[in-house]
Every structure is written in C-alpha cells, then in structure tokens.
Amino acid sequence: MKEENKKAKACRKDWKNEPMPEKHETFVLQRSFNEKQMDLLRAGHIPEVMEDKWFFYVEGETLFAHRSWTGYCIYRIDFKEDDHHIVRVNRDPEQYGCTDIKEDIVNLNKLLDYWTRDPYDHYEEWLDEIQDGLKKAGKE
C-alpha cells in the first residue's frame, strides 16, 4: 500500500474523550486476534460522519473505545498475550445504560468484529445497532 493511502493512527487528542468513570465493572474477554486484526485495532478509528458512533485508539496495549457524540469511555480493553483480555466497562447510568456483562460481551464482540474488518464499515455497524435496539424494544 502506498504511504499516502495509509490512514493516520488515531490517538487520544484526535477527538473529544472522557476518562473511564470510577463506576465501572471488569470482566475477562476470551478472544484471539491475528496480527492483521491487531494492526487494524492499533490504527484506531476517528469518526467521519454523524452515524459513525465510535472513536477508538490504542495506547500501549490498551484500547479505549469512546462514543463519538459524547466522548464517554464505554470500553477499555487491556490486551493480554494469553488472549484473556481485561475489559473495563462503564457503569455510570448517566453515560451508559447497559448493566449486564453478558450483553456487554456480545456487544463488544460485535464491535470488535466490525473494527477488525478492512475496511471498517461504520454504516453497517450503525444499522446493526439500530436493528438490535428495535429487537430489544419489541418493535421488530
């Protein structure tokens, strides 16, 4: 790939972001990533349009995932070599409504599936989120 076609790596200063609140929960995410997937995650993502709901970046071996509109940190993933990654998830009810670890594991895995695609399609991810919301509301 030509150098000029490579996206700049996302970093903390690229977008509005808040720290993980004191009110959070921790769980272990068992998942392996190949080198290409880790490279995509390390590159991060800077939102480009309103429907692009996530800003994420990696510092060291930690991924920080923030909602693009509010800057709230929803997930923090500390990557581990044994594929037992430590995840902190926001539990501040004013910032994030989910309170169920099982639901967070499903949601985070879906996000990671999208974020490790090349190229990442924020629009497809947005549609999937809308569909999940309708299912939860019993509207589908």
Regions found by a protein language model. Give the residues of each.
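Short, flexible loop/turn elements at secondary-structure junctions
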Residues: 60, 67-69, 91-93
